[in-house]
A protein has these predicted regions:
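Sequence-structural signature of mature extracellular/luminal beta-sheet repeat domains
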Residues: 1-265
């Protein structure tokens, strides 16, 4: 692989992830078979399955948000905000109600013609379950990147990788956020939650490994990753106790004692 990212698992525990510079989405089945699911993929980045089995993907080539059906039919959910291109949809979390939270930082890509970000802020957006409303819910972070939430749909975590902090928010019924509190003084490229509410976090520029924090923000675990960068994580496998780590040019897995909290992440 050239650079792996965006891990998510379907309802059967099969892993899907991106090999972004090679413009492809890969599948690693529960019986250990590797195949190409979609190529080209619009240089997809962060991904997560929704409850209907659609693969929600940050489509990086044209700064869009896609929904890829099981038959690989593509629906474009978001193309712009207020008539302007998004900066670069990076990672997503699909809430239990079907709403989608998306981080939109700016990382200059070699496949873009433009060199400046289109929007003033590097924000977190929310797309309503009916796909009719898109609005920013976080505007005050330096570079939001990793994102995940609790399976009850009440709490959202957002990592500010440039600010090197991860924040916790309460989710309101309309999808907006309140009660911003500091979870831990560490940013993260990607992250996920286990069934105990522990947060599993990837590289932040200071460390390239995977670090685990309990719900109070206390570090309780550390996984050495023999790569230059750990980009993202998700739980999968038949028992949902396998932690998959996309890291630089490789894909890693480690058997955990706990399951993932979210069905697809």
């Amino acid at each position: 692989f050239a650079f792996t990212e965006g891990p998510t698992c379907d309802k059967n525990g099969n892993l899907f992830f991106v090999d972004q510079p090679n413009d492809r989405i890969m599948e690693w089945s529960t019986d250990g078979k590797l195949s190409t699911f979609l190529q080209p993929s619009d240089y997809a980045n962060g991904m997560m399955f929704d409850a209907k089995g659609n693969l929600i993907a940050c489509a990086d080539e044209h700064n869009e948000l896609w929904s890829i059906a099981p038959d690989k039919k593509i629906s474009i959910l978001v193309t712009n905000f207020d008539g302007k291109y998004l900066n670069g949809p990076n990672d997503v979390w699909v809430a239990p109600n079907g709403g989608i939270y998306m981080t939109d930082p700016f990382y200059r890509r070699k496949w873009w013609d433009h060199t400046m970000m289109a929007l003033t802020n590097q924000a977190v957006f929310y797309l309503s379950p009916d796909r009719q409303k898109l609005f920013p819910v976080v505007n005050d972070l330096k570079k939001p990147n990793g994102i995940t939430g609790t399976p009850d749909g009440k709490t959202l975590y957002v990592a500010d990788i440039q600010g090197d902090k991860t924040w916790r928010y309460d989710i309101l019924p309309d999808g907006s956020l309140t009660n911003k509190t500091l979870f831990v003084a560490k940013g993260s490229d990607g992250m996920t939650i286990d069934e105990n509410g522990d947060l599993v976090m990837c590289a932040n520029g200071q460390t390239n490994d995977v670090t685990i924090f309990d719900k109070t923000g206390k570090q309780i675990g550390h996984i050495d990753v023999p790569e230059e960068w750990s980009a993202n994580v998700c739980f999968g496998g038949k028992d949902r106790k396998t932690l998959f780590i996309t890291a630089s040019k490789s894909l890693y897995s480690i058997q955990m004692r706990v399951k993932g909290a979210n069905p697809a992440k």
